[in-house]
Amino acid sequence: MPHESSPDSQHEHGVAVEAARPEVAPPPFYQVMLLNDDYTPMDFVVDVLQQFFSMDLDKATQVMLHVHTRGRGVCGVFTREVAETKVAQVNEYSRMNQHPLLCTMEKA
């Protein structure tokens, strides 16, 4: 008696065996960090947080004050490609506006 097979299972002696599906690990995430400096105006930092990280004024102000008092702060957590893009955008925008504000990323 012929056995029928489907893409998801094989029949061996009347027992259905599901084909193994490869496990895919979730992508690693990275924190995008702003570093404090003594020259970049606070309102510029708030503008960066609103423009590049879609924060409202209250949240952007809170993060800016955290960066100012603690030396650095998290702007968001993203996949590597998104984090790299945001770091490059913020650093380029800061240089274009003649500010030394530095944005970095580290594994979350």
Swiss-Prot record:
Q: Which InterPro entries match?
A: ClpS, ClpS_core, Ribosomal_bL12_C/ClpS-like
Per its UniProt record, what SUPFAM superfamilies does this chain match? ClpS-like
The protein's superkingdom reads Bacteria
Q: Which Pfam families match?
A: ClpS
One GO biological process term: protein catabolic process
Q: Where is this region: Disordered?
A: 1-22
Subunit note: Binds to the N-terminal domain of the chaperone ClpA.
Q: What is this protein called?
A: ATP-dependent Clp protease adapter protein ClpS
In its UniProt entry, the species of origin is given as Stenotrophomonas maltophilia (strain K279a)
| Gene symbol of the encoding locus | clpS
